[in-house]
Amino acid sequence: MEQTFIMIKPDGVQRGLIGEVICRFEKKGFTLKGLKLISVERSFAEKHYEDLSSKSFFSGLVDYIVSGPVVAMIWEGKNVVLTGRKIIGATNPAASEPGTIRGDFAIDIGRNVIHGSDSVESARKEIALWFPDGPVNWQSSVHPWVYET
């Protein structure tokens, strides 16, 4: 089953949106396979966003991620990467549809509440970085109610 990495950024944590984010993924039918609240070290944030290191906003992005705790999660389910991105909304909240996390809770691109893997390959890399011991091995009892066998 496909997995994705989702991170509630410091603004989402500070604003008390952790439960709301988890609720949206659970209500969709996805299974939480890993969860931790963590204060991110600068070098770790730089590694996570290394593909953006040449961008002018990189330093500010790293400053933002280390400014407070984040919630790192692994979610599992059919097409969870693509569907997770739809639940999250566009990177720029101004372009996010109402009903998405960013459409409902974010205004500024620099404080857009949440990160989600943009591909299956990115998800694998991010999960390996944030959860080196891997996900929790369990299956939800609602699995048969979400997926056809």
UniProtKB/Swiss-Prot annotation:
Name the positions where ATP binds: 9, 57, 85, 91, 102, 112
Q: Which GO terms describe its cellular component?
A: nucleus; peroxisome
Report the subcellular localization: Peroxisome; Nucleus; Cytoplasm
Modification sites for N-acetylmethionine: 1
Q: Does the keyword RNA-binding apply?
A: no
Report keywords, A-Z: Acetylation, ATP-binding, Cytoplasm, Kinase, Magnesium, Metal-binding, Nucleotide metabolism, Nucleotide-binding, Nucleus, Peroxisome, Stress response, Transferase
| Assembly, per entry | Interacts with CAT1, CAT2 and CAT3.
Tell me more from the record.
Plants over-expressing NDK1 are more tolerant to paraquat and have increased ability to eliminate exogenous H(2)O(2).
Q: What does this protein do?
A: Major role in the synthesis of nucleoside triphosphates other than ATP. The ATP gamma phosphate is transferred to the NDP beta phosphate via a ping-pong mechanism, using a phosphorylated active-site intermediate. Plays a role in response to reactive oxygen species (ROS) stress.
Protein name as annotated: Nucleoside diphosphate kinase 1
Q: Which organism is this protein's natural source?
A: Arabidopsis thaliana (Mouse-ear cress)
> What is the gene name?
NDK1
